[in-house]
Amino acid sequence: LGSSPQVPWEATSAPSGTGPTRASETQVQDSSDPRPVVRGVKIQTGFPQPELLDLPWSTPLAEWPDDVLVAYPRGISRHVVRFAQVGDRVLAAKETTARNAAREYDLLRRLRQLGTPGVVPVAVVTERHTAGGDELPAVLLTEHMNFSLPYRVLFSEHPDAVIANKLVDALALLLVQLHLAGFYWGDVSLSNTLFLRDAGRFAACLVDAETGEIHPQLTKGQRSYDLELARTNVAGELMDLLAGFEDDSHDGPPLDPSMKSGEKTRYEPAAATSALPQIMSSNPVPVDPFATSERIVESYENLWNELTGEEKFPHEQKWRVAERVKRLNDLGFDVEEASLDTDDDGFVHLVPRVVEPGHHSRHLHNITGMVARENQARRILTDIAQFGRALYPGLPEDLTGSLWMQEVYAKIMAAVPADLRAKREPAEIIHEVLEHRWFLSERLREDIPTAQAVEDYVESQLRTRPDEQMML
């Protein structure tokens, strides 16, 4: 979307052969006419796409036919949510009230304009009715993010403390970015977030903005409340997760009799949470929910203080200005504006006022045209620098980046079979190949050519992994 506002586009659908019928109007059925009563629907969207009119809006979302749906999403939600194929895109559809749908749509649009990580709002669908005339909930449509993963998918085999720590670090960074933009979330949780792989770490993206508010600037109380919600919700979600794994390990019938044979046992969050003390007393727990939830508070506060805190130093230590900027760059932020004041005692007061995330991503894009997340970009920039020093010393960085794209990037991607490219994004594949090359070189105590590293990576690593491009 960029920073340009979307112009809402409204459409009303009507049954074929009846002419243009407004969504607020009904077709009155004559007593002698056997045809059923059909009602219109109102669609407000910034993406005028005629395929939206073909979705079964007169059917409750929970009853949409399989030929429309891509997959049933896993996870816990207070709303009915389904994924539908619309043209060449996959959209997430969520039933809610008309007021909440319109409000969340507007919030997501404004967050996109502010540059914060969030799903793309596509449309609000209102004035839905069944063929019999019964009113149906409104629907909010958002675009599914390719390669995004719900947190439960990342724990599909077993709980892992390293993954848990990386997830809460990503959530802390997302919360800082949202708060800097003036967004009060009101429902911070792992469940309301999608995660994308980012060079061995994760990047977090807001999915549910239903309870959010945008202000010119958040108060300390608003930020603290969001952070406390994050701490509480993360602990609860991890406890539910651990209890679910314990339930899965038991022999016997599944807890939910409606489940098909061979599916993993489902569980209710409240029941799972209440079972946790027994689990923790009888088995070692690889993830400590309470320590992990405290980590998000620590990560958030450290990052917030580094990005916004005042630094005071003597006038003769002016080098500390450049040092502070470099620290922020290393964290992935550019300083767009700062206050640099002196007092009567000769001390300098430095306060960053406007910081912009994406320092390494922008730098990489400028010299290569490549799109990558922050940690992916950081890793690739390191390889470009090493590539330049080894083969083209003294060459300008933009030319080095162009040569790296031809001699490294293009050759790596050409060596990855097309049928395996849905398993990881290109930037993540590049990162993993570079890491694999280093691992092989360390193990064999010799430099391994990139071509050999790619071949080994494809067969020993990538081929066995699930496709994550459209994992729901």
Q: Could you describe each region identified by the protein language model?
A:
Residues 128, 195-197:
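Short, low-complexity Ser/Thr-rich regulatory SLiMs
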Residues 261-431, 469:
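Phosphate/pyrophosphate-binding loops and the adjoining catalytic core of nucleotide-dependent enzymes
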Residues 188, 193-195:
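Hydrophobic residue at the +6 position relative to the catalytic HRD Asp in the kinase catalytic loop
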Residues 202-308, 312:
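C-lobe/activation-segment region of protein kinase-like
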Residues 28-69:
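Juxta-kinase regulatory segment immediately upstream of eukaryotic protein kinase catalytic domains
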Residues 52-153, 158-161, 165, 170-185, ...:
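Conserved ATP-binding subdomain of kinase catalytic cores across diverse folds
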Residues 2, 17-19, 262:
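Residue-identity detector for glycine
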